[in-house]
Regions:
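ABC family nucleotide-binding domain
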Residues: 1-195
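C-terminal boundary and immediately downstream tail of ABC-type ATPase nucleotide-binding domains
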Residues: 185-186, 190-192, 196-215
Length: 215
């Protein structure tokens, strides 16, 4: 739903990231249909049109190492949205300010910490004005002291009404920000509930076992 934050949790190797990657056909589902905004997602002309509206933030940032921070953010709006260099730069600088990194515009990715790189990756995704943002374990590759700076940006986006699907092991984020929580194991969604119900009164025994080990 629009402005909803859906959090997907589960053990490692359970298929959480695969679900996320199927939402924009980075991986092709072996069966069934995925419908986004009333459009069935399939190979063809509509796939790229839908991908333009779906931003993705990866576990390991995936910034282009040969481009500056500013160039990383400007690239897609210019090549895909047809923005002028001036328009793309103005948008990129505004987004860098939003994530607290306007002083890093001319830096190269390898000059940044992991937390800073992930905030740049979020700004890059936002530069396309997506209708929904997908986050694939955005904090799992970060040092513990850098996790908060990324989660703070994500919480801010949620407060502003960004529609988000988040695969994460950050249970505090799921409780605080999520509107719905999905529990996935062995490629199957075993449980779906509000955060309050999910964490205080899970129904599925596998969910109970999982939560008992991590909380």
């Amino acid at each position: 739903k629009e402005k909803e934050v859906v959090v997907i949790i589960g053990p490692s190797g359970s298929g959480k990231s695969t679900i996320l990657r199927c939402l924009n056909h980075l991986e092709v589902p072996s069966g069934g249909k995925i419908t986004i905004d009333g459009i069935v997602l399939e190979e063809g002309a509509n796939l790229n049109a839908i991908r333009r509206e779906v931003g993705m933030v990866f576990q390991r940032f995936n910034l282009f190492p040969n481009m500056s921070v500013l160039e990383n953010i400007m690239l897609a709006p210019m090549q895909v949205r047809g923005k002028t260099k001036e328009e793309a730069k103005a948008k990129a600088m505004a987004l860098l300010k939003r994530v607290g990194l306007e002083n890093k515009a001319d830096s190269m990715p390898d000059e940044l910490s992991g937390g800073q790189q992930q905030r740049v990756a979020i700004a890059r995704a936002l530069a396309m004005n997506p209708q929904v943002l997908l986050f694939d374990e955005p904090t799992s590759a970060l040092d513990p002291e850098m996790v908060k700076e990324v989660l703070d940006v994500m919480k801010s986006l949620a407060r502003e009404g960004m529609t988000m699907v988040v695969v994460t092991h950050e249970m505090g984020f799921a409780k605080e920000v999520g509107d719905r929580v999905l529990f996935v194991d062995k490629g199957v969604i075993l449980e779906e509930a509000s955060p309050e119900e999910f964490f205080t009164n899970p129904k599925n025994q596998r969910t109970k076992d999982f939560l008992s080990k991590i909380l």
